[in-house]
Structure formats: structure tokens, C-alpha cells
Swiss-Prot record:
Coiled coil ranges: 838-870
Catalytic activity line of the entry: tRNA(Val) + L-valine + ATP = L-valyl-tRNA(Val) + AMP + diphosphate
Keywords of this entry: Aminoacyl-tRNA synthetase, ATP-binding, Coiled coil, Cytoplasm, Ligase, Nucleotide-binding, Protein biosynthesis
Record organism: Bartonella quintana (strain Toulouse)
SUPFAM superfamilies tied to this protein: Anticodon-binding domain of a subclass of class I aminoacyl-tRNA synthetases, Nucleotidylyl transferase, tRNA-binding arm, ValRS/IleRS/LeuRS editing domain
Pfam families tied to this protein: Anticodon_1, tRNA-synt_1, Val_tRNA-synt_C
Gene: valS
Known partners and oligomeric status: Monomer.
Protein name: Valine--tRNA ligase
Motif segment ('KMSKS' region): 554-558
């Protein structure tokens, strides 16, 4: 027997253990013989990570599809795993060492420190895997992979060496995002833009050959900068070729204040005549845009920072090249060398002001890139790094999408993909860390590089090159975490070995991802998959939206509006959270997550639980001989027709990745059709002495509930699995767990029965609505008079009159040729249904009540209208407040209309 209350917390834990004990999610479980494979790769979360709402949405969507395809009998593999998360993991362990007062990373040395990280990984790393289990994800956990596992590391080395020998990996000196606290290059995804209240300094740069006079604009050119500390590396000034103010200066030179370096004035479209003075100082070694301008105009690159973002002047040959070492320059070097960049900023501004070079200072709020791990401003930094020639690898990846071999859902994301791929830059793949895949490159005594899969192979290559044994030094850098992630669809299946899994499951079937990693992960999987496997890694990329708070704001720690999915699971259940996310996962629309919605879908789960209890109390049980096509009762034929439509809607919705439409169809059918109407209409049947009708109703209800559990299972797996178990009967043993049951396939259709029962529901609904609007006491039975009833209506009243009386609180049903005075009239089909109000309520009292209500509503509408017609309110109030007021006035107008209709009925 089912408990009175559904205890989600204990049941979800119990069901999770059952799935695991059964091995329900292992690759191929439940697959029909000879069926096609279906494979999804779980985007590997960081081993340091904790479940957030983005994970919850992403994995819920994947799990819906995976459970659906598993129930359809496909050979399913949902491959889970963890990312080693280079920077994040190294930072976590270093912080732990400091907290425990253990030796630092540097004191430990590389080998011991890496061992320490592995210890942390085995002891506490990977918490998120257990958190994902709480959500109910049906991955094959027995195949869990880790990007630092030996098998995946082998694949990484194979790819690196192959690309290097094909000329697609090389070393180069370019600008990178440099974190001066962590002392490593970082990816764009590890950079967050923060708004700061900064300044814009306008400087006068003297023109060569002119005597500088701050009061004479013909002796200088004005440039502006938010970063005075970088001016020491200036090598040019750019002006727009169409800017008449500077055409005569193009090709001439200015002098860098304080330093004396000649700066060529070049014509370049990067300079915007409408911005500031229209002239831009160019620092190619410290700004990404300037780097490109410098390349186009052959300007020198002068790095004036150390790796710690301190000023680097002493022994900086590039800085001194072409300069006369005056006493002033010596003093400048002495004062600024090794100064922190922000201290140097203030010193340089002071020196510029003293020399008359400071023209103006403006307050200038602007965004500054910060390292998301270190929290410090990152620097565009000129350094030697390893790169992948992404441009060449991107071409076939772009073509594959153009040809439709890989499609994006929604299709609009294709444009974003093309924009990124067609403007792709070399991919910096080296990181100055100890944790990660160490680059398989060794250097000889003369710096000659040997790239091989192992040290033994590198030594052999060196011997062949030098003709003798030499000592090699391995490259200290590790690979960007995204490098190993890019191989995920085939490295996890055993590549470069030829395995059965690789042959069966590559290419995979679907990639589900957030839009923020289309470039970082999806595009790179496309490039690597095509290059090494000769085929796209997946035919479909489903891009889900962002989960925002209930007001539509992006979640962030600074705003204090982060919603913890684990807290929601504790409070409402995993199933309720999953269903909420599915309902709100409309394509291309961000999810505004309101906890009250989750509470509502918890009630939805309770509704089905109670419906099952009601069914069992009323003797509902399985009949092995039950066949839908043999059903006789119109009520049962109607529910089977509605169920068939729901099966089609849910199936089509999941197939087309319209999860909200599937969830909506399920909600309407379960809450309204099944619980509110079918079970309600069955009560007289259950209570009757007609054993044949009762038996059919009991068997049909049991069969329909089973199909409902199956349909709802991908969305609410825990509760449906429990109900599947609890509704097993001795004469109907379950063949297996619900997770491995067959997906519903029903094409039952009885339009006549559907028309009859839907008519009955419409009549009851209309009468109930009028009773509520007219304030008719719930206990008072009402007479019903039907005017102009045709043959169909009379036949239906004859068949369903008893049900109508019971459910609509009707005392008598009569037919008439004329409409009664002072009656509520409802037109349904060809007939008019009348409730004579004079016999039911005090007309004058009811009229007074309604007039009072409508007057109050009109006053409220007037108040809100005044607000909304005030431009200052609309412009200055928060958008969500304005939207709330607009919604309120719409609700009031709906209520106003309903009361007006009720008043008309009293005339």
C-alpha cells in the first residue's frame, strides 16, 4: 500500500541505490537486439566543482533524452567523466597546503606536489559526481573517465605529437591572457570582465622636429589611455587615414615622453576619429588590438612587464634599443624598475604632469579583465607558448556545419559558430602549471626540440640527430585543459586503440551544451573529431539557455542571487526541480527560475501519488488480458484517446528537443484529464454494482497509470520508479525496472467517445464557473434548464445526466423552448444551458456585492494607469517592477470583465 504522503528524500535515495544495484544504466542495458546505438557525452565537470543551476539544466535535458532513448530500446551509452581542471585544482590544493601549514608547492617540488594532487583527487575530488547522482542522471557510472587517466593521457600525447609532426602545433611568441598572480597563461573563458571606476588620461606626445610647447597644439599630438603604465612600451601612434586632422602627420614621428623613443605615426582603420582625439598610442606588446595594428604596420614589440606584472626596464634590451642613455632616462629606470604596475601608473602620471605632458584626466568607468580564479587584473603578455594552427583545423569543421552534417538547435546558434570559426586565432595550448598533461617535448643541449610520445622515443630521436647520447630537458609546461576535453568524444571510447566501443558509439548522437562553451568545447571537438576520426563527433548540438533568477537577472556571487540546486532538491525533491527546468526549457529562451514554480511541480508529483493511492483504494489492479482496443465504456475509450494524443505529443516534443512542450502535455494530461476528470468521473463506476463496468474501469485505470509512469519517467524518474514498483501485483509481475521498460506506443482513437466526454466536461466546467462567479453556495443544488436541445444533446443527457447532476451540483434537468428570465446562460453546441438565479441567491445582495467589487477594481486600474502613464516611473523604476504593474493591470481587467458578465446575468 502507498504511504499517505510521498517522502521524496528517502525514496530518491532508495531508488538511486536500486538503479545502481541493478546496473540499469550500463551501456546497452535494455537494448533490443540489433538496435541502433545512441551515445551522449556528459560535458566533464571540473573535479573541483560543485553542482550549480547550469549543470542541473544541462544534465536534466540530457537525462530526459537518454532515458527516452533507452526506453525505446536503443543501445544507449551516456559517458560520464571529470575534467582535471588544471588551474582550479592546483589552486585548491595550494590553498589546502597553506591552511594545513604544509610545505608549499615550490618547497615540495613538482613530483611530490603532483602526487599530493592525486591524493586529494582520490580523497575528496569529484564530489560533483555524487551530486549529479542526486539529480538522478542515468550515466554509465561504471565507465567514468578522468582526463588525467592513463588511457586519456595516451590519447592526448598521440594527438599532440601527430599535430606537431603535421606542422599544426608549433611554438610562437604572441600575446596571451596572462595571470600575474598564478603566473600562467589562461583562456578567454577563465577571464571575467569587471566594471571599475577608472580614469582616462589624455597625454601630449611631442612631434619630432618641433619644440614642445603645451600651449601650442602644432607641437604635439594628443593620445588617451586608461593604462599609463604601458606607455613605456609604445612603439607607434595610429590615426585614421580618412581623418583630415592628421593626414599631414602620417609617416612622421612623435617622441615618447619621459623615454625619447621615436614613434611612427601610421594610418590604420583601427583609429576611430570620433573617439577622443582620434589618435591612438600603440603598445603592441601589451594590448591585443595594438598587437594586430603593430603587425599590420611593422611596429616593434617591447615588453615592459615581468611575469608578475612589475615594470621591467633594467637589462631590457628591447626597451633601450635606439635610445640615448641620458641621466633622465637612467633616473626613470631606477625609479620604475620592478615597481608594481599600479604604483608605476601613479608615478608615470605624476612625471607626465610635471613635464607638461598631461592634458586632462576624465572619470572613465570601464571594464577590466580579471582572472576568475585569482581575482587580479590579467595582462596581455608577450611570451613564448605552444599553439595549435586552429585556422586550418577549423575549415572542415565549418564546412561540416554548412553541409548539415552537424546541426545546431536552435538553428540561430549556427551564426555564432561561423562567426567564431571564421575569425579564429591560433589556439594557445600551453599553461605554466604543474598539474595537467605535461607537454611531450624535450630539448637538447642546443635547444633543439624533440616532440615524441615518450622520453625513450625522444632520446632515440636525439641520438639520431646528434649521433651520440645527450641529456634532454623536458618542457615544463602543461596543456590547456580544453585540449584534452576536445578529444572527449573519442578518447573516452578507447582511441587511439581500435575498440568495440569506438566502433559502436562514434560518432556520438547528441551534444548538449550551454552557449558559453560553443567555441571552447563544441568547436574544438568538431575540429579534433574530424581531423582524427574523419567524421563529425555528433550530428546535433542542442544549445540550452541560461538559468537566471526569478526576476531574469544573471546569477552571481556579487549580486547574492545564486540559487543552489542542492538546496532546492532538499526542499522540493530532485524530480520537482527536474520537471520545473524541463517546463521552462523553451528553445532560445532563458530560464527564470522561481522557487514557487518548483513548489507547484512538487504538488504535481503529489497529485499523481494521490491519484495512484485513490486507484489502489478503489481496487484498481492489472489484468494481464487487458487490451485497449477491447474497451467498451465511453469514459475508458475517451481516456485512451487522450492518452494516445499525449504519447504522440510527448514523443514528438522530446524528438524535436522541445522539452517544455512535452512537459506541458504531460502536466495537462495528468493534472486535468487523468486526475481532475477521469478518476472523478469513474467514482460512480467504482461504487456501482455493475461488475463488468467496474472491472473494465479498474483494469483500464491500471493500464493508463502504467503508461503515465513511463511517459513521465524521463522527467520525474524517482517517483515514477517507486510507483512502478508499488503498483506491481501478484498477477502482473514487473519484468524489470521502469528505467528499462518499453516506451509507450498507442494509437487508440475514438472521436465519438472523446466528443461525448469532452462535452460533459465542458458543461460541468461552465456550470461550476457560473456557480463560483455568482456566489451560489456550494451546498445548494441548482435546477438546470436546457433550451433548444437537439437530438445529440438529449442523448448525452440521457447517458451522462446522473454524472452531470453529481459533479455540477444539479438538482433537476429539464428541457424548454424558451430562455428563462434572470438566468445564467451558457451556450454549448446548439443548446443553451440556463441556471435560474432567482431560486439560488439574493439577487439584490449579490448585485450590490458585485458593484462594490467592480468599483474597487476600477479604482485600482486607475491608480496603476497613472503610474504607467508617467514616463519618469517607466524610465526610472526597475524593469521587473514596471512589468509587474503591467501584469497586475491585465489581471484586474480580466476580473473586471468577469464581474461585468456576472452583473449582466442579474438583469
Amino acid at each position: 500500500m502507498l504511504e499517505k504522503n510521498y517522502d521524496a528524500a528517502s525514496i530518491e535515495q532508495k531508488i538511486a541505490k536500486r538503479w545502481e544495484a541493478r546496473g540499469a544504466f550500463k551501456a546497452g542495458m535494455g537494448a533490443k537486439s540489433g538496435t541502433e546505438p545512441f551515445c551522449v557525452m556528459l560535458p566533464p565537470p571540473n573535479v573541483t566543482g560543485s553542482l550549480h543551476m547550469g549543470h542541473a539544466l544541462n544534465t536534466t535535458i540530457q537525462d530526459i533524452v537518454v532515458r527516452f532513448e533507452r526506453m525505446r530500446g536503443k543501445n544507449v551509452l551516456w559517458q560520464p567523466g571529470m575534467d582535471h581542471a588544471g588551474i582550479a585544482t592546483q589552486t585548491v590544493v595550494e590553498r589546502q597546503l597553506a591552511e594545513c601549514q604544509e610545505p608549499t608547492r615550490q618547497e615540495m617540488g613538482r613530483e611530490r606536489f603532483v602526487e599530493r594532487i592525486w591524493e586529494w583527487r582520490h580523497e575528496t575530488g569529484g564530489v560533483i559526481a555524487n551530486q549529479l547522482r542526486r539529480l538522478g542522471v542515468s550515466c554509465d557510472w561504471s565507465r567514468e573517465r578522468f582526463t588525467m587517466d592513463e588511457g586519456l593521457s595516451h590519447a592526448v600525447r598521440e594527438v599532440f605529437v601527430t599535430l606537431y609532426k603535421q606542422g599544426l602545433i608549433y611554438k610562437d611568441k604572441r600575446l596571451v591572457n596572462w595571470d600575474p598572480k598564478l603566473l600562467t597563461a589562461i583562456s578567454d573563458l577563465e577571464v571575467e570582465q569587471r566594471e571599475i571606476k577608472g580614469h582616462l588620461w589624455h597625454f601630449r606626445y611631442p612631434l619630432e622636429g618641433k619644440v614642445f610647447d603645451p600651449g601650442d597644439p602644432t607641437t604635439f599630438i594628443t593620445v588617451a589611455t586608461t593604462r599609463p603604465e604601458t606607455m613605456l612600451g609604445d612603439t607607434g601612434i595610429a590615426v585614421n587615414p580618412e581623418d583630415d586632422r592628421y593626414k599631414n602627420l602620417i609617416g612622421q614621428s612623435a617622441l615618447l615622453p619621459l623615454v625619447g623613443r621615436r614613434l611612427l605615426i601610421v594610418a590604420d582603420g583601427y583609429a576611430d576619429p570620433s573617439e577622443g582625439s582620434g589618435a591612438v598610442k600603440i603598445t603592441p606588446a601589451h594590448d591585443f588590438n595594438d598587437f594586430e595594428v603593430g603587425k599590420r604596420n611593422n611596429l616593434r614589440l617591447i615588453n615592459v612587464f615581468t611575469q608578475k606584472a612589475e615594470i621591467f626596464l633594467h637589462k631590457n634590451e628591447a626597451f633601450f634599443d635606439g635610445l640615448t642613455l641620458s641621466d633622465e632616462l637612467k633616473k626613470l629606470v631606477e625609479n620604475l624598475d620592478q615597481a608594481d604596475r599600479f604604483i608605476a601608473r601613479h608615478q608615470i602620471v605624476s612625471l607626465m604632469e610635471e613635464g607638461g605632458y598631461l592634458a586632462a584626466v576624465d572619470d572613465h568607468p570601464h571594464t577590466v579583465p580579471h582572472g576568475d580564479r585569482s581575482g587580479v587584473p590579467i595582462e596581455p603578455f608577450l611570451t613564448d607558448q605552444w599553439y595549435v594552427c586552429a585556422e586550418q583545423l577549423a575549415k572542415p569543421a565549418v564546412e561540416a556545419v554548412r553541409q548539415g552534417r552537424t546541426q545546431f538547435v536552435p538553428d540561430s546558434w549556427k551564426k555564432t559558430y561561423f562567426n567564431w570559426m571564421e575569425n579564429i586565432q591560433p589556439w594557445c595550448i600551453s599553461r605554466q602549471l604543474w598539474w595537467g598533461h605535461q607537454i611531450p617535448a624535450w630539448y637538447g643541449p642546443d635547444g633543439m626540440v624533440f616532440v615524441e610520445k615518450s622520453e625513450e622515443e625522444a632520446l632515440a630521436a636525439a641520438f639520431s640527430h646528434y649521433g651520440e647520447e645527450v641529456e634532454l630537458t623536458r618542457d615544463q609546461d602543461v596543456l590547456d585543459t580544453w585540449f584534452s576535453s576536445a578529444l572527449w568524444p573519442f578518447s573516452t571510447l578507447g582511441w587511439p586503440n581500435k575498440t568495440t566501443e569506438l566502433d559502436t558509439f562514434y560518432p556520438t548522437s547528441l551534444s548538449v551544451t550551454g552557449f558559453d562553451i560553443i567555441f571552447f568545447w563544441v568547436a574544438r571537438m568538431m575540429m579534433m573529431g574530424l581531423h582524427f576520426m574523419g567524421e563529425v563527433p555528433f550530428p546535433t548540438v542542442y544549445v540550452h539557455a541560461l538559468v537566471r533568477d526569478q526576476k531574469g537577472a544573471k546569477m552571481s556571487k556579487s549580486k547574492g542571487n545564486i540559487i543552489d540546486p542542492l538546496e532546492l532538491i532538499d526542499q522540493y525533491s530532485a524530480d520537482s526541480l527536474r520537471f520545473t527546468l524541463a517546463v521552462m526549457a523553451a528553445q532560445g529562451r532563458d530560464v527564470k527560475l522561481d522557487p514557487s514554480r518548483i513548489a507547484g511541480y512538487r504538488n504535481f508529483a503529489t497529485k499523481l501519488w494521490n491519484a495512484t493511492r485513490f486507484a489502489k483504494i478503489n481496487g484498481v489492479k492489472h489484468n494481464p488480458a487487458f487490451k485497449p482496443e477491447k474497451v467498451k465504456l465511453a469514459l475508458n475509450r475517451w481516456i485512451l484517446t487522450e492518452l494516445s494524443k499525449t504519447v504522440s505529443a510527448v514523443t514528438t516534443g522530446i524528438e524535436n528537443y522541445k522539452f517544455n512542450e512535452s512537459a506541458d502535455a504531460l502536466y495537462r494530461f495528468i493534472w486535468n484529464t487523468l486526475c481532475d476528470w477521469y478518476l472523478e468521473l469513474l467514482k460512480p463506476v467504482f461504487q456501482s454494482f455493475n461488475e463488468e463496468a467496474k472491472n473494465e474501469a479498474q483494469a483500464c485505470t491500471a493500464w493508463v497509470l502504467d503508461e503515465v509512469y513511463k511517459l513521465l519517467h524521463p522527467f520525474m524518474p524517482h517517483m515514477t520508479e517507486e510507483l512502478w514498483c508499488l503498483t506491481e501485483t501478484p498477477n502482473m509481475q514487473r519484468k524489470d525496472m521502469l528505467a528499462l521498460a518499453q516506451w509507450p506506443e498507442i494509437t487508440f482513437l475514438d472521436e465519438a467517445a472523446a466528443a461525448d466526454i469532452n462535452w460533459l466536461i465542458d458543461v460541468i466546467t461552465e456550470i461550476r464557473s457560473v456557480r463560483f462567479e455568482m456566489n451560489i453556495p456550494a451546498g445548494k443544488l441548482a435546477p438546470l434548464v436546457i433550451v433548444e436541445a437537439g437530438e445529440i444533446t438529449r442523448e448525452r443527457i440521457q447517458r451522462y445526466g446522473a454524472l452531470l447532476k453529481k459533479l455540477a451540483r444539479i438538482e433537476t434537468i429539464d428541457f424548454s423552448d424558451r430562455v428563462l428570465a434572470v438566468s445564467a446562460q451558457m451556450v454549448l453546441g446548439e443548446a443553451i444551458f440556463c441556471l435560474p438565479l432567482g431560486q439560488l441567491i439574493d439577487l439584490e445582495a449579490e448585485r450590490a456585492r458585485l458593484v462594490k467589487n467592480v468599483s474597487k477594481i476600477e479604482q485600482d486600474i486607475e491608480k496603476i494607469s497613472v503610474k504607467l502613464n508617467n514616463p519618469k516611473f517607466v524610465e526610472n523604476a526597475k524593469p521587473e517592477i514596471v512589468e509587474a504593474e503591467r501584469n497586475k493591470i491585465l489581471e484586474l481587467r480580466v476580473a473586471q470583465k468577469k464581474i461585468s458578465i456576472a452583473l449582466e446575468r442579474l438583469v
